[in-house]
């Protein structure tokens, strides 16, 4: 399989970035949910530190994914009604925006809480904002709101892919599945 996208399918670079980010998002939801349920203490702090590290990883991968997309356009969508084409493009760009906004809102929340953010303990990241309890609360609310937006848009993305695979039978889903073209 080629590294670059072709007219018929995504190359292995785009596919790898897509599926690694999907896997990390599942890890993030799990860690975030676990952290919310833990009492304040060592275990919660370790879980949140991992959540932040994976969030920064997703942010870095999103930068790479977007740069790859700009230099390596995706294959064209199969024929479909104009509104579906528009909805697909809006959904993709909204998902990209969330891949940036989610980690940044979490990073700003930590900064406003005066809690340092590091990447797996190797690199300490600078604060994005100064300590401020009110802003910490606002960034927390924003982070949770964006999470619900991500769930909704990712769910729509999955449902649309399944629709194209099993109802439209247009091969759209197979463009992002690793392996031989089908």
Predicted regions and their residues:
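Membrane-embedded alpha-helical bundles that constitute the cytochrome b-like, heme-associated redox core
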Residues: 1-182
């Amino acid at each position: 399989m080629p590294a670059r996208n072709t007219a018929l399918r995504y190359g292995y670079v785009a596919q790898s970035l897509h599926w690694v980010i999907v896997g990390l998002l599942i890890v993030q939801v799990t860690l975030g949910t676990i952290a919310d349920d833990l009492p304040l203490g060592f275990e919660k702090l370790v879980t949140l530190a991992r959540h932040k590290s994976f969030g920064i990883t997703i942010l870095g991968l999103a930068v790479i994914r977007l740069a790859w997309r700009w230099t390596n356009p995706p294959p064209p969508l199969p024929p479909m009604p104009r509104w579906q084409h528009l909805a697909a493009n809006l959904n993709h760009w909204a998902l990209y925006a969330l891949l940036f906004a989610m980690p940044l809102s979490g990073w700003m929340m930590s900064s406003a809480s005066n809690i340092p953010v590091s990447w797996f303990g190797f690199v300490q990241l600078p604060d994005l904002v100064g300590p401020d309890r009110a802003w910490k609360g606002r960034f927390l609310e924003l982070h949770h709101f964006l999470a619900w937006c991500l769930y909704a848009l990712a769910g729509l993305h999955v449902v649309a892919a399944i629709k194209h695979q099993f109802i439209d039978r247009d091969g759209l889903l197979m463009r992002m599945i690793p392996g031989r073209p089908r």
